[in-house]
């Protein structure tokens, strides 16, 4: 992560969390502007260039006349930085970015009446506090999913059941040390993954929410992360690089998105994923509209299109995520009948979804500290 991302995170969160003021959303839509600029996670918006079966852009462009341009971002901090610079209409923001974008007035509330497919949303996500603030709705849910433990099946003939294989120095089932063979996510929000591990292994600390940590709890989590540093082969944020590391660099265990595991399995690589006993973090992503979007009509058209069942199912099949429209589970031959079950549709209540840590008057450690400390830890300090 660059220092620019870190600075933008700190600035965005230096504001007190209050109800954000923004322009009132439109009541009707004019003619589409002919263009749409979106910031998205890798693999989230495909037009058939990687695999021609996976294309949910071409038909949208034909039907609306909105030419879609995608800028991929590898971390939430990068998304916040890009939205701060401006020039984009939409962003597929995870919960650790959405509040920062709302409080930083980088996104505007939407009028859900202009999104006919809104009524098809999964009730579990409709009221998510990562995009509903002060009685206003800041965006359209897109996909959700878990951060799983991905492992090499040759190294682990029996699936590992705990995150300790990436946090604690040990010999793995093949008799070799895990030193230099495991990875961690290159983003401050990974502190929450370590907090889940500490919550399970040090119950006396009383961690209830891995994103809202007292100073004592936070220091215990940092201790685990500092100890982990000597085990780390690479702090990953680029999905392609992580997949290459599993194929070519001897990496055998790491947190990962289902996307990487699906891609590696499709190549015949010996990898699998597991939901460890300590639990997992996860992401519920929202398509959010920039406060100064130049193409708002195309943006509204896209938000509605993104909620069509087949698009939802196709994205879930490609990324290894879950649709926010339950009908998406049945609408995509690419996802298949069991796709939602395989990807974890019933895990929703067991996932600690990414959100922005907030101080709440000094009771908890704020995200600005998470950012500073995680950069130091990745640098070996």
Curated annotation (Swiss-Prot):
Optimum temperature is 37 degrees Celsius. Gene3D superfamilies: Periplasmic binding protein-like II. It comes from the Bacteria. Optimum pH is 6.8-7.8. It comes from Escherichia coli (strain K12). Belongs to the bacterial solute-binding protein PotD/PotF family. InterPro entries: SBP, Sperm_putr-bd. GO terms for molecular function: acyltransferase activity; polyamine binding. Its main location: periplasm. Residues 1-22 form the signal peptide. This is Bifunctional polyhydroxybutyrate synthase / ABC transporter periplasmic binding protein. Keywords: Acyltransferase, Periplasm, PHB biosynthesis, Signal, Transferase, Transport. Catalyzes the formation of short polymers of R-3-hydroxybutyrate (cPHB). Involved in natural transformation. Probably part of the ABC transporter complex YdcSTUV. During natural transformation, may bind dsDNA and convey it to the inner membrane channel formed by YdcV. Coiled coil: none annotated. GO terms for cellular component: ATP-binding cassette (ABC) transporter complex, substrate-binding subunit-containing; membrane; outer membrane-bounded periplasmic space. GO terms for biological process: DNA import into cell involved in transformation; poly-hydroxybutyrate biosynthetic process; polyamine transport; transmembrane transport. It catalyses: (3R)-3-hydroxybutanoyl-CoA + [(3R)-hydroxybutanoate](n) = [(3R)-hydroxybutanoate](n+1) + CoA. The keyword Transmembrane does not apply. It is found in: Periplasm. Its EC number is 2.3.1.-. Induction: Induced under nitrogen-limited growth. CDD domains: PBP2_polyamine_1. Disruption phenotype: The deletion mutant contains 30% less cPHB in the outer membrane than the wild-type strain. Natural transformation rate of the mutant is reduced by 2.7-6.7 folds. Mutant is also defective in chemical transformation. The gene is ydcS. The lineage of its organism: Bacteria, Pseudomonadati, Pseudomonadota, Gammaproteobacteria, Enterobacterales.
């Amino acid at each position: 992560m660059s220092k620019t991302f870190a600075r933008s995170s700190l600035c965005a969160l230096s504001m007190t969390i209050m109800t954000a003021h923004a322009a009132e959303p439109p009541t009707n839509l004019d003619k589409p502007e002919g263009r749409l600029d979106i910031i998205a996670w890798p693999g989230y918006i495909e037009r058939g260039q990687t695999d021609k079966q996976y294309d949910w852009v071409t038909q949208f462009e034909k039907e609306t006349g909105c030419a879609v341009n995608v800028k991929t971002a590898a971390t939430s901090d990068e998304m916040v930085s890009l939205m701060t610079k401006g020039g984009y209409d939409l962003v597929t923001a995870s919960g650790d970015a959405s509040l920062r974008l709302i409080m930083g007035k980088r996104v505007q509330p939407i009028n859900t009446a202009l999104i006919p497919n809104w009524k098809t949303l999964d009730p579990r996500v409709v009221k998510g506090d990562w995009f509903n603030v002060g009685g206003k709705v800041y965006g359209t849910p897109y996909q959700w999913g878990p951060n799983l433990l991905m492992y090499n099946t040759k190294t682990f003939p029996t699936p590992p059941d705990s995150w300790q294989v990436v946090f604690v120095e040990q010999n793995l089932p093949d008799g070799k040390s895990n030193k230099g063979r495991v990875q961690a996510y290159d983003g401050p929000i990974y502190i929450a993954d370590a907090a889940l591990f500490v919550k399970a292994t040090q119950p006396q600390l009383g961690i209830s929410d891995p994103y809202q940590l007292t100073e004592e709890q936070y220091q215990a989590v940092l201790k685990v992360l500092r100890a982990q540093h000597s085990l780390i082969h690479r702090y990953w944020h680029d999905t392609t690089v992580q997949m290459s590391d599993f194929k070519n660099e001897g990496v055998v265990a790491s947190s990962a998105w289902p996307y990487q595991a699906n891609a590696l399995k499709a190549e015949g690589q010996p990898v699998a994923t597991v939901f460890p006993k300590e639990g997992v973090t996860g992401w519920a992503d929202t398509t959010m509209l920039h406060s100064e979007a130049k193409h708002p009509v195309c943006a509204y058209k896209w938000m509605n299109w993104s909620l069509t069942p087949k698009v939802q199912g196709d994205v879930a099949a490609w990324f290894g995520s879950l649709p926010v429209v339950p009908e998406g589970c049945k609408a995509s031959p690419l996802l298949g009948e069991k796709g939602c079950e395989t990807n974890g549709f019933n895990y929703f209540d067991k996932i600690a979804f990414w959100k922005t840590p907030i101080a709440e008057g000094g009771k908890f450690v704020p995200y600005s500290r998470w950012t500073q400390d995680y950069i130091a830890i990745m640098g070996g300090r």
